[in-house]
Each structure stands twice: as C-alpha cells, then as structure tokens.
Amino acid sequence: MLLTILLATHVLSLLLWIGSLVSITRVVTAGVGEEPAVQARFAALARRIYRTVASPWMGIATLSGFGMVAAARGMYFRFGWFHGKFTLALVILALHFVLGARVRAAEAAGRTDGVAPQMRALQLAVLVAAALAVGCVIVLKAVRGA
C-alpha cells in the first residue's frame, strides 16, 4: 500500500514538475520582442513559477522516488531500466537548476531576449529527457520484465 501511494505521488509530482519547467520556457520565450516592461513582467512570472511550482514539485518527486526505493528495500537496483531512468532523472534535475539560473538572469536583467534561445534548447532537452525516462520505464520494463 505504501509503495502504491508513493508511486502515485511520484507520477503526479513528475507531471507537475516537468509541466512547470516547460511552462517556464514558454513564458520566457513569449516575452521576446515585447517592450522592456513587458519582458520584465514575463521574467518575474517565470521566476515565480520556478519558485512556487517547479521547485516544490521537484522536491516532492525526488523524495517520493527515494521513498519508493527505500520502501522496496532496494529492489529497483536489480533492474536495468531503473539505472537508465535514474540517470535521466539526474539529467532532468540538472536541467532544472540550469533553467533556474537562466530565469534568475532574465529577472535580474529585466529582459527575456538574452535567454530566449537557451530556453528553447532547454525546453527541448527537458521534453526529450522526460520522454526517454518514460521510455525506460514503459518499454524496457515491458521487454525485460519486472
């Protein structure tokens, strides 16, 4: 029962975390070409989403993931798909902090023009890493069992 609750919490938090990361990149790129005051508002909104949505859900996803490993008494380490998923989770975690640094830079500058090209690349990287992580769980788990 505990494992089921942790799994549901993990999936929900991942959806909200990844969705918020993509939303941040969309907010920043939406401000490109606008007046400086409008760009400053877009940058502030992106920072607010990062602080109030993305970071808390990242923490919940991380804690529920470690909770699942602990509740299963390390069983996941025997499965090859878990190692791929864990590696991709670390990549997404790193992208989270890179995205946060870019958002802070945009807010400090009061403009989104300078970080918009990086945001497009970060958006693609987050989506690809998330899709590959889902592929590790669904495809490899189905093929190899567990």
Labelled PLM ranges:
Residues 1-146:
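Polytopic transmembrane helical bundles with strong interfacial aromatic enrichment
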